[in-house]
């Protein structure tokens, strides 16, 4: 049986590559048919030539993440293993080498699936990109990473993050407190993504300067946004009028990403989703990309993927 031994600086580095968890090595054997043992500063692989090649590149990818300062937890191991098994070594290399740098003090962000990589490439190539699909596919997170990277590289002069405050019917004037207090609950997911990728003091500084703006969709009306990276999140809860208003805000040197889940519409019955209409009307317009995610792109808890699959099957049977 073919074998190959991978050598590392010390035992700690070798064990970090599988998060000090023997069950991850067990998963490797179950998924690739490769037995992996680790002692001191090495990992020994035993199995078929193809399996060893895939396993070797799995560890090369994880080591690259470690060197970049990114953690290797059970979920990172599982994502990389899933890619190298189903998509192959070449795709794993593509994902590893495409690290989006958001700040000098942060390790950066990489796509975890082939679908996510396609999404990043679409954002790079198009001025308007739609990311449509179920929760947990990284639509918003990756868009925020691309926005911060564009700001860092001087490609844009500001970032604008927005989403409909549909729970309040956009009637924020009727809520108690100042504007910041009113909008914070609706915009928290966008702020969470920012804090993952940029130190808090930098976020505050950029917010005070107006370089980063987080605001409800209603506050976009009447503006022309030049040299900006604009993200509309939860776009399924924008009305058709709001979506058209948002899309026509785009000015010179700007890029927009619109994300949403067409199965999670919270609008009143008399309102139509702007995302559904835009998806249908704009998908073949030159300069606009529409990326459709599937349950295979879910990168949350493994159960989330199975939950989405179960609901899809249930809804399909109801239609029949």
Model regions and ranges:
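Short amphipathic alpha-helix segments
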Residues: 13-30
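Conserved adenine-nucleotide phosphate-binding loops and their immediately adjacent elements
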Residues: 96-108
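Interdomain "pre-motor" coupling segment immediately N-terminal to P-loop NTPase/helicase cores
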Residues: 37-96
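Conserved helicase motor core of SF1/SF2 NTP-dependent helicases
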Residues: 42, 106-114, 118-232, 236-320
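Compact, well-ordered interaction domains used in eukaryotic information-processing assemblies
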Residues: 26, 32-41
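Short glycine-/aliphatic-rich beta-strand segments at the starts of folded cytosolic domains
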Residues: 1-16
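Intrinsically disordered, low-complexity mixed-charge segments
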Residues: 2, 6, 70, 88-96, ...
């Amino acid at each position: 049986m073919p074998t190959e031994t991978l050598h590392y600086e010390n035992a700690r580095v070798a064990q970090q590559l599988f998060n000090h968890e023997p069950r991850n090595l067990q998963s490797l054997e179950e998924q690739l048919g490769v037995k992996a043992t680790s002692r001191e500063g090495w990992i020994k692989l035993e199995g078929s030539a193809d399996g060893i090649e895939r396993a070797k590149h799995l560890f090369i990818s994880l080591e690259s993440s470690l060197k970049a300062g990114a953690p290797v937890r059970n979920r990172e191991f599982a994502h990389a293993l899933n890619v190298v098994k189903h998509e192959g070594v070449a795709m794993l290399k593509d994902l590893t080498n495409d690290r989006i740098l958001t700040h000098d003090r942060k390790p950066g962000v990489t796509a975890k699936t082939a679908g996510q990589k396609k999404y990043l490439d679409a954002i790079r190539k198009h001025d308007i990109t739609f990311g449509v699909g179920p929760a947990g596919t990284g639509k918003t997170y990756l868009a925020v990473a691309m926005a911060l990277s564009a700001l860092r590289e001087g490609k844009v002069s500001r970032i604008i993050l927005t989403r409909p405050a549909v729970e309040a019917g956009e009637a924020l004037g009727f809520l108690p407190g100042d504007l910041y207090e009113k909008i914070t609950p609706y915009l928290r997911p966008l702020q969470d993504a920012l804090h993952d990728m940029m130190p808090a003091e930098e976020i505050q500084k950029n917010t005070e300067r107006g370089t980063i703006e987080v605001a409800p969709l209603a506050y976009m009306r009447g503006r022309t946004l030049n040299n900006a990276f604009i993200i509309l999140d939860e776009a399924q809860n924008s009305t058709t009028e709001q979506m058209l208003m948002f899309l026509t805000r785009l000015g010179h040197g700007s890029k927009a990403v619109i994300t949403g889940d067409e199965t999670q519409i919270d609008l009143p019955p008399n309102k139509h989703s702007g995302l559904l209409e835009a998806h249908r009307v704009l998908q073949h317009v030159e300069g606009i990309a529409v990326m459709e995610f599937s349950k295979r792109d879910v990168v949350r808890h493994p159960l989330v993927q199975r939950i989405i699959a179960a609901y899809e099957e249930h809804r399909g049977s109801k239609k029949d």
